């Protein structure tokens, strides 16, 4: 068995993968191939992605989609409709208007935010189990899976690694960390996962987790920000107001068996 690492930039983030296998290069090459497919399926920033095809057809027609995409939208809708949830996968129009984290980010005026809030109702995402179709009832609606997709993709990669006979692995998908199998670098089998101190530069940790066969997901207001007219705006939007969530929380970490659950709950609970 040999341990190898690969780093690739996809989905607007840095992805690190570390695997232990008899043929680690082939495993990592296939993982990168799959990541490119997942990006084409789940991205809200690629106009040609399968998700964006749904959004382009908003108010016009349903679209039959890949089972993975259908499942993730179904899960996202369920958690978007939960009482007091900060997660709303129909928040796409607001995310694309604020554009926090991109070069063209701006603060929308209050009237525009109110107008966009009217097309962010997750109840108007219609799903057909029988046909595996997704239909957005109102023109202008758009789904954004940014609060779910990285975790879900990390879980898909983990499943692939296990089926391919990988003995142990670490996946760091833009802050979504998944580990399974024994760590090859410590005396005990547990992996050490550092939690970034949001007040200090990279690689300064406020805590170090010891985990195995689990995922650690961190959401924070310090990652992507917009400064305008002397105010700082972070990228985690409150689906009730359309503005960045007002909170004293800077960073929230959830440890879960599945990475997608960690993503769901960091978003649902952020600022509460």
Region locations from a protein language model:
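Mature catalytic core of soluble alpha/beta enzymes
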Residues: 1-272
């Amino acid at each position: 068995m040999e341990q190898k690492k690969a780093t690739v930039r996809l989905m607007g983030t840095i992805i690190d993968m570390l695997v232990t296998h008899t043929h680690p290069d082939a495993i990592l090459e296939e993982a990168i191939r799959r990541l490119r497919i997942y990006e084409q399926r789940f991205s809200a920033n690629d106009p040609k992605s399968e998700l964006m095809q749904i959004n382009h057809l908003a108010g016009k027609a349903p679209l039959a989609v890949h089972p993975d995409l259908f499942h993730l939208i179904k899960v996202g809708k369920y958690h978007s409709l939960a009482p007091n949830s900060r997660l709303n996968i129909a928040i796409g129009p607001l995310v694309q208007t604020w554009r926090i984290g991109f070069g063209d980010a701006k603060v929308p005026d209050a009237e525009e935010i109110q107008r966009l809030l009217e097309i962010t109702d997750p109840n108007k995402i219609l799903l057909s189990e029988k046909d595996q179709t997704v239909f957005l009832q109102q023109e202008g609606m758009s789904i954004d899976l940014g609060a779910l997709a990285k975790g879900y993709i990390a879980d898909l990669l983990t499943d692939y690694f296990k089926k391919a006979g990988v003995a142990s692995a670490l996946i760091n998908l833009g802050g979504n960390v998944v580990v399974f199998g024994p760590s090859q670098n410590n005396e005990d089998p547990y992996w050490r996962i550092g939690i970034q101190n949001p007040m200090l530069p990279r690689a300064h940790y406020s805590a170090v987790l010891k985990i195995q066969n689990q995922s650690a997901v961190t959401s924070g207001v310090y990652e992507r920000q917009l400064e305008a007219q002397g105010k700082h705006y972070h990228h985690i939007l409150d689906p009730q107001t359309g503005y960045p969530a007002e909170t004293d929380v800077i960073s929230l970490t959830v440890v879960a068996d599945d990475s997608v659950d960690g993503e769901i709950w960091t978003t649902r609970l952020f600022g509460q």
